[in-house]
């Protein structure tokens, strides 16, 4: 016989595919095996046994009905006539007599073959082969989607990920956290779920899509001691699983090839079932035990009419009825499958019950082939979907990232990154991490925390452990904060720096930091809430003293006006956007420092002259060409620092002499050609920067500046320095590089406090040895060509090189 196992290749699939075989597919597989056995058994009998046995019919005209009946019975049954009674004279001898046909074995074989081909109905001949073929087609249809490249690749990928998610220690840990919930909460959740199920009746809603999930037990009995332990390797594996699930979901949700293929193969099986039932029911009666055969072979055998016996007719008849029963059950199962496919919304899958039972509220619903495979999984075991859902949750992913972060960033490793920032605070910078490690809050000596390009940061209540924390920097970070952490920051935070690209990166909780003293904002702001980020009122920042905004505003935001009464320093860096409305400046009566940088200003704003408390004004990188309004600065008695650098100012008006309180003046990177002697009537100037202009002459009145400590005319066109410059005995820094100087006066030795001298880029041929009298000047503070330095006496050179 042919073993059934030879046909397993038609239905063979990977053992892991069983999770995508619902009960009806398993049931039809068993039915297919039964039908396959019928076909194989019938084919084996057909091959190994005689198909038909025929005897010739002899027509005798003069016989009564009795004798004809005897002859017919003899021919049909191929049994000899009863022997004649033995002669009494010879009782020991018995002679067997019957109807002689005068046919040999070859002729009988020929007759059997001819009658099998001509007289026997085709259904009786090919019944076992038809059963075998139909069954193999059923098997191919049932398993085609497991073999087709376009679908099998998705299925294999899905099952691979599913198995890893099911066995992942992170899944056990995530679900074990749910099992520890308060029993009252779980009872309330269950009651709410039952009520929602009662209300939702009639057509299936979104919850009914995953109705099989209701059979999942609400609690998992997990040993928390084992569930809580997750080493670094397991954490990395779980992290990789999250990425795989994300990519797989994006790939599979794009199409519905799996659903379409499963529907088509089911429809094909139903059509085939109807065809089989139709023609088998009509032809099963053609399987007869006795067959009359009329073939024209009289010239070869001497007979034309034959009576044949289909030896397997009785068995085939029973097998055909049995086969029809199996096919009927198979077909009804396929009809139920079609009902399930079209009645249920299988292109959408809701995790509503999983969200309710696990408390993980952000598990998304899925669609298309992803949803269909999950529906199929639920028919196998709903627990697979529940454990798989853990890897669809961003909350779960964030918890895992947090755990991995804590394992990677230990307190000792974080302490190695500590540094002192510009505010002389001990700062910890963290850049481009997946989150904020909990171990940060174990570094109690931390004074400043700087976070850059970190998404979904959650500041926990444990930040209260950082007793010394005063400064927080958030650069392109979306931050959420625990209520207890917010209370801590309200009391302790002094400095907040925020760099943002969109509204999500501008923390809404910053408006309530009542003890905040310094606020630095960098990002695009707009007065139109529909276009960009808007700044809300800062009125609750009662302690705010310094406000810096680097943005593109066209006027001073109203939020700034809300803190004008106590604001002491305001900086606006406008990135070239023209600042046109400055009337709100008049309300900032306590302002001591004002920076309007890169605001495309063409004139000094008149509102500035109302700031009687102003001490420092910076108008860097504007479009100032004339500063005639500088005369109004005489009313600003406290103004000590004026920065007009990086503009297009061509001359300095004589009115500058009225700024008698001026101590620091920045005029670099302009187009000044002539220095007015009246400038040096501001005799309190300690810092004077005139570098990068077109100045050719330094007035001798510079000697009046007896408080001058810093003087720079780098990159001008000065050809000589007045001797009066060396009367400025307090001068510490002198920058005269990149000019047209040819001689350095020996009087430079009068500058006893000189510690920095830049003379590089001139036409000097020799340096005066009097430089040795500048005891504070060392080689590191002398910027000069090496060849020119060698012109100094050796003792002077050694003196400068000495520490």
UniProtKB/Swiss-Prot annotation:
Gene: Lrrc8c
Region (Disordered): 177-211
PANTHER family per the UniProt record, alphabetical: PTHR48051, RAS SUPPRESSOR PROTEIN 1 (PTHR48051:SF1)
Cytoplasmic side: 1-22, 147-266, 342-803
Source organism of the structure: Rattus norvegicus (Rat)
Function: Non-essential component of the volume-regulated anion channel (VRAC, also named VSOAC channel), an anion channel required to maintain a constant cell volume in response to extracellular or intracellular osmotic changes. The VRAC channel conducts iodide better than chloride and can also conduct organic osmolytes like taurine. Plays a redundant role in the efflux of amino acids, such as aspartate and glutamate, in response to osmotic stress.
Sample GO molecular function, one term: volume-sensitive anion channel activity
Keywords: Cell membrane, Disulfide bond, Endoplasmic reticulum, Glycoprotein, Ion channel, Ion transport, Leucine-rich repeat, Membrane, Phosphoprotein, Repeat, Transmembrane, Transmembrane helix, Transport
Swiss-Prot/TrEMBL GO biological process terms: aspartate transmembrane transport; cellular response to osmotic stress; cyclic-GMP-AMP transmembrane import across plasma membrane; fat cell differentiation; intracellular signal transduction; monoatomic anion transmembrane transport; protein hexamerization; taurine transmembrane transport
Feature: compositional bias, Polar residues: 191-211
Protein name stated in the entry: Volume-regulated anion channel subunit LRRC8C
Listed PROSITE patterns: LRR
Superkingdom field: Eukaryota
């Amino acid at each position: 016989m042919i073993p059934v196992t030879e046909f397993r290749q038609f239905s063979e699939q990977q053992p892991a595919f069983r999770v995508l075989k619902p009960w009806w597919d398993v049931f039809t597989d068993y039915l297919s095996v039964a039908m396959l056995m019928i076909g194989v058994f019938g084919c084996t009998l057909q091959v190994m046994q005689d198909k038909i046995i025929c005897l010739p019919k002899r027509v005798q005209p003069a016989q009564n009905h009795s004798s004809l009946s005897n002859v017919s019975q003899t021919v049909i049954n191929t049994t000899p006539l009863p022997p004649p009674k033995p002669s009494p004279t010879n009782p020991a001898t018995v002679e067997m007599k019957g109807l002689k046909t005068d046919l040999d074995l070859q002729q009988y074989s020929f007759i059997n073959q001819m009658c099998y081909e001509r007289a026997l109905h085709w259904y009786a001949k090919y019944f076992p082969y038809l059963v075998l073929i139909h069954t193999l087609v059923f098997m191919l249809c049932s398993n085609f989607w497991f073999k087709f490249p376009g679908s099998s690749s998705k299925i294999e990928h899905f099952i691979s990920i599913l198995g890893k998610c099911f066995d992942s220690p992170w899944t056990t840990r995530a679900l074990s956290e749910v099992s520890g919930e308060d029993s009252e909460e779980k009872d309330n959740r269950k009651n709410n779920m039952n009520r929602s199920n009662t209300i939702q009746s009639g057509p299936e809603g979104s919850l009914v899509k995953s109705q099989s999930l209701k059979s999942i037990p609400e609690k998992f009995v997990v040993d928390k001691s084992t569930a809580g332990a997750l080493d670094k390797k397991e954490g990395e594996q779980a992290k990789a699983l999250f990425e795989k699930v994300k990519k797989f979901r994006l790939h599979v949700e794009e199409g519905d090839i799996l659903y379409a293929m499963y529907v088509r193969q089911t429809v094909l099986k139903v059509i085939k079932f109807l065809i089989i039932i139709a023609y088998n029911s009509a032809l099963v009666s053609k399987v007869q035990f006795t067959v009359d055969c009329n073939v024209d072979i009289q010239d070869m055998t001497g007979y034309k009419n034959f009576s044949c016996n289909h030896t397997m007719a009785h068995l085939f008849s029973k097998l055909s009825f049995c086969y029809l029963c199996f096919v009927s059950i198979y077909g009804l199962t396929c009809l139920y499958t079609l009902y399930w496919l079209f009645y249920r919304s299988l292109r959408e899958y809701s995790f509503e019950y999983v969200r309710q039972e696990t408390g993980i509220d952000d598990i998304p619903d899925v669609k298309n082939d992803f949803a269909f495979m999950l529906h199929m999984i639920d028919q196998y075991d709903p627990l697979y979907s529940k454990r798989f859902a853990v890897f669809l949750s961003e909350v779960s992913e964030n918890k895992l990232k947090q755990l991995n972060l804590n394992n990677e960033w230990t307190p000792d490793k974080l302490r190695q990154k500590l540094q002192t920032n510009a505010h002389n605070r001990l700062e910890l910078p963290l850049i481009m991490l997946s989150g904020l490690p909990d171990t940060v809050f174990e570094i109690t000596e931390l004074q400043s925390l700087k976070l850059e390009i970190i998404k979904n940061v959650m500041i926990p209540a444990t930040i209260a452990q950082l007793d010394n924390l005063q400064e927080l920097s958030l650069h392109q970070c979306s931050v959420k904060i625990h209520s207890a952490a917010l209370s801590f920051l309200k009391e302790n935070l002094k400095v907040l720096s925020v760099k943002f690209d969109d509204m999500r990166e501008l923390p809404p909780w910053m408006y309530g930091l009542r003890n905040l003293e310094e606020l630095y904002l960098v990002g695009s702001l707009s007065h139109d809430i529909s276009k960009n980020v808007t700044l809300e009122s800062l009125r609750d920042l009662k302690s705010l003293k310094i406000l810096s905004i680097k943005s593109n505003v066209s006027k001073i935001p109203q939020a700034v006006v809300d803190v004008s009464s106590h604001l002491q320093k305001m900086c606006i860096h406008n990135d070239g956007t023209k600042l046109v409305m400055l009337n709100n400046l008049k309300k900032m009566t306590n302002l001591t420092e004002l920076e309007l940088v890169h605001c495309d200003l063409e004139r000094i704003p008149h509102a500035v002259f109302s700031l009687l408390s102003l001490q420092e004004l910076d108008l860097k990188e504007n479009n100032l060409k004339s500063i005639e309004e500088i005369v109004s600065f005489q009313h600003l008695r406290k103004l000590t620092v004026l920065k007009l650098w990086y503009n297009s100012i061509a001359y300095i008006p004589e009115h500058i002499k009225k700024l008698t309180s001026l101590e620091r003046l920045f005029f670099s990177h302009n187009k000044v050609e002539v220095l007015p002697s009246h400038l040096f009537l501001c005799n309190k100037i300690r810092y004077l920067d005139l570098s990068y202009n077109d100045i050719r002459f330094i007035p001798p009145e510079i000697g009046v500046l007896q408080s001058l400590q810093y003087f720079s005319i780098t990159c001008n066109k000065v050809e000589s320095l007045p001797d009066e410059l060396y009367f400025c005995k307090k001068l510490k820094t002198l920058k005269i590089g990149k000019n047209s100087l040819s001689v350095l006066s020996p009087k430079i030795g009068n500058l006893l406090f000189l510690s920095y001298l830049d003379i590089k880029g001139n036409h000097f041929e020799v340096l005066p040895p009097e430089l040795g009298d500048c005891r504070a000047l060392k080689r590191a503070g002398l910027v000069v060509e090496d060849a020119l330095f060698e012109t100094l006496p050796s003792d002077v050179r050694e003196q400068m090189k000495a520490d």
